[in-house]
Amino acid sequence: MEQSLNIRYIYHSSFSLEFEDKIIIFDYFQGTLPKNVNDKKVIFVVTHSHADHYNESIFDYENASDITYIVSEDVYEEIFDYDTKDNVVFLGEDNIEDLKKHFGKKVIKLEVGESTSVYGADFTALGSTDMGISVYFEANHLKFFFAGDLNNWVWEEDTEEEKEKMQQDFSKEIDKIGHVDIGFFPVDPRLKERYDLGVNEFVDKCNPKVLFPMHFTKDPTIVDTFIDTHDYEGCKVVNMKKEHDTFQVIIK
């Protein structure tokens, strides 16, 4: 029986993957979250605590009755940072409400190498060349990879040694992924002419059938440039750069 998957662009590196039975939302920090979820279950995934990938307002999301949060270790520690609290603070009214809010949620900490299954989707945390994790996951017979801040971050001012180290670290992580059907990967214009080093290697080694460029913030023209200058065999690059842009996948 055919199923549909709607992938909707929210902002920067945030997407919602809207299956018939669940919605998976990655790295939300601003924009409009899904409102009409009906009886679908919702999974928020947060790869790290950078301000352009995480907003604690996700814990105030009330449009679904069944919500699970999968977060990296640094985000988890930020949520449950009790080492910095003393007994007086714990007894404060605001902090009690904060504890109630977070303990009432299903929050799963996912460290590199760990896996978890939620609502029929299987998630595995892989490494990053920046902060936090990247995520490989399988859902509804499809294989996905969401890079988070995993990229070949080679900057103009880097030394040759730094560039070589970054290349080695990046390739080491990419080699762990394997084939995927759908990938989400940075094309950051701040890297200038090196912006496609990471995504080129990802496509070459992981052979995604569909690729979603991300991490371009206020410069969406990089997506047009990327599509105009790259023609990957067997891989469709999706041009989604405005909020609510949607791409539909039919699952057979």
Describe these PLM feature segments.
Residues 30-78, 172-184:
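Active-site metal-binding motif and surrounding structural segment of the metallo-beta-lactamase
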Residues 4-5, 23, 65-69, 209-210:
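Short active-site oxyanion
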Residues 168-173, 192-201:
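A short, acidic, amphipathic alpha-helical segment used as a generic capping/interface helix at domain edges
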Residues 25, 45, 70, 144-147, ...:
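Structural motif
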Residues 1-39, 97-179, 243-252:
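Core dinuclear metal-dependent hydrolase active-site scaffold
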Residues 37-39, 56-59, 81-84, 158-159, ...:
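Short amphipathic alpha-helical segments
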Residues 8-12, 87-118, 196-252:
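Binuclear metal-ion centers of metallo-dependent hydrolases, dominated by the metallo-beta-lactamase
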